[in-house]
Amino acid sequence: MDKRTSESAKSLKKNPPKPAKKEEVLQGNEACAKGALYAGCRFFAGYPITPSTEIIEMMSSEIQKCGGAFIQMEDEIGSACAIIGARWGGKKAMTATSGPGYTLMQEAIGFAAVTETPIVIVNVQRGGPSTGQPTMSSQQDIYQARYGRHGD
């Protein structure tokens, strides 16, 4: 292990800020980001897509305060592959996306499953198709999460 690597590893052992002693009212995306930091997530790779963008915004500013690293990736595929690499490096890592982005991640998810690499992907579900709930509500994101991948 070279000097840069050992110094970097030491900096990632910082503890997250202590939870607030008072009760807080949080939106789901805020709670997700804070929970990940309190659980020890120290690497986040993401690509902005609504409705998960708030997680990416919060992680980009807060993870560095805990000694972690944030990377905005070129797309959702890169995000999934980056967290697989971070896990291989021994870091707790996650990404966040929504239905269309989760669809793009399927090959990487299948790869993580085959290599038994534990990863965390937050799939923030939309209320229905892209036009919203007034048109039709459905469960397609749940089906994609449960039955996705390419037959691996």
Question: What residue spans do the PLM features occupy?
Answer:
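Thiamine diphosphate
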Residues: 1-148
